[in-house]
């Protein structure tokens, strides 16, 4: 066992040969490497599988022995400074290793088919393997310096993968946005690391925690404030990496990368890195109560914000991205409350559920591309979907399992972990608990909204009702594909938000009359306006994905069904079946938490029934609003008559419009950043440019112009006439003496006498000089 731990340092470097060999192959043998590009998926999967087996073995040893292994190499630079590098294998590292490798293998297996048509296939697998290497190095780091190095490598890989299709301007902009936003957090992380080293003299976790504890125990207020500041800076790095408020704005734009990358980034790697950092540094944060309160506050804000922003998204991947943001907020909330076990439990269950949802969405997008062509604006648009359950039944089943899990429906994975966080939130703060429980209802609503828009009803892409010609007939098409005759003037249309522009003030349920162009002056606005897209259609309907993609979905379904078994807290006296608690025992003792908590069935049912009822309410509302049966209710005008009786219809419309605008415009946070930060920086740049060109250059150019015009003016006085020189000489002498008499109070008559005598002498001298010139020349 000791032998295995000693060589565990090689874990991060096992996948590294793949990007190195791909790069060398493209440089030395480009034609052969490209011709046999599909071969490279095998070593990528094989090497990561080796890491997974080693990680599972280490985790088994952790469970059986509750053992923490750390090995450090010291590099002495001089007598006063040395760097220490090593690796740390503890329960947290073991959990993250299994999470990264299992999800990574399935993503690699899935990507082999998903990216087979792409010219950047080799580049994709090189990036992906290096991404896995960086993340494995991050979770096994034994000190803050190593964490920062691999932290930056993870950020670099995410930049490359988000902008994988860099020829698309929107993808290039998205990767730059992610990179710049994360630079804010990374700068804070670097300052926090340097600050802690300055006060403790060590980067190692154990030494750092011990020294900081001693400093705080001495009741030194200066040390406490400085440690609090450093902790805040460290937390800023986690906020950016895990897309927490207010540095979350990069997350939805990260969807411009390939879908397998979205699954990896939003499930087990990049966004999980911030949660991992807070969990790793939790002993430091625990001794600074203000930081713990800040962590929980940021977490609960992100929980609610992510859920509300997901309500009106048309893009299926953006909806899942905001869902990820909200679920990461739950984990951050749990860490801020001190619920270390609940946070890691939800990290595990959410990783597999969200990977299943993203890979399922990739299967959906893959099937839609055969109809609408390659265009993310069309293939990812849920407005053009619908009725896919008849065409992609396996994907539908897998997506439904992931949706139910994320909604918190038992016995699926996320139910157990989310319920534990909700229960702990009632003990921490009733206000936070109310917000967290309400968000659970929002989660169920928007996730079933995504499911119903995608799989129920009819395929909406086949209803192309406006071709841009005068003679084209206009239909008002309901969400589920049923053509409504043009004579209907005020149909009660479900969720008009799907076709609204950002500046429109249309309610959720009522259509407006609006101008479209010169061909159509005024018409009833259709629920879905689909322009005819000229493309080659290989299939008239979507088709199920290949078996290699479905295999990854099947394995993730199994994980979603059974992974929660490792953490179900039904421990009774005399039995201990909670594997997660046994694994986390060393960490729990480090945090001074009691691990002997037993949960009986009555308490569990009481707590779970409330959260499940909220989730079912959200599902019911989504089903009521989005289920195809609504079309028949609309035809009978049942909801129309009910809605028209409302006395507060105008107010209700305004509320719905506000909710839609808030969600679709990303809470106006991006706009605020654009106006305040981007606009402010541009304004400062323009001011600097004006000051440089007009003031600095103006002063220098002013001296030059003044000298030029003065020289041009004086050259006319140098005509060669002595009388002119004499006149100027006399004038300057008079001015000088006049100023001198003003400052020295010299009598004026003395000045006149001096001027008269000097003038006479000057005239005599000039006359003699002129006479001399006349006689000799």
UniProtKB/Swiss-Prot annotation:
Primary localisation category: plastid
One Pfam assignment: Proton_antipo_N
Keywords of this entry: Chloroplast, Membrane, NAD, NADP, Plastid, Plastoquinone, Quinone, Thylakoid, Translocase, Transmembrane, Transmembrane helix, Transport
The keyword Repeat belongs to this UniProt entry's keyword annotation: no
Membrane topology label: Multi-pass membrane protein
InterPro entries attached to this UniProt entry: NADH_UbQ_OxRdtase_chlpt_su5_C, NADHpl_OxRdtase_5_subgr, ND/Mrp_TM, NU5C-like, Proton_antipo_N
Residue ranges crossing the lipid bilayer per the database entry: 9-29, 40-60, 89-109, 125-145, 147-167, 185-205, 220-240, 259-279, 290-312, 328-348, 355-375, 397-417, 426-446, 550-570, 604-624, 731-751
Catalytic function, reaction form: a plastoquinone + NADH + (n+1) H(+)(in) = a plastoquinol + NAD(+) + n H(+)(out); a plastoquinone + NADPH + (n+1) H(+)(in) = a plastoquinol + NADP(+) + n H(+)(out)
One Gene Ontology MF term: quinone binding
Compartments reported by the entry: Plastid, Chloroplast thylakoid membrane
Entry EC number(s): 7.1.1.-
GO cellular component: chloroplast thylakoid membrane
Gene Ontology process terms (BP): ATP synthesis coupled electron transport; electron transport coupled proton transport
Family named by the database record: Belongs to the complex I subunit 5 family.
Role, per record: NDH shuttles electrons from NAD(P)H:plastoquinone, via FMN and iron-sulfur (Fe-S) centers, to quinones in the photosynthetic chain and possibly in a chloroplast respiratory chain. The immediate electron acceptor for the enzyme in this species is believed to be plastoquinone. Couples the redox reaction to proton translocation, and thus conserves the redox energy in a proton gradient.
Self-association and partners: NDH is composed of at least 16 different subunits, 5 of which are encoded in the nucleus.
Protein name listed in UniProt: NAD(P)H-quinone oxidoreductase subunit 5, chloroplastic
Organism, scientific name: Oenothera elata subsp. hookeri (Hooker's evening primrose)
Gene: ndhF
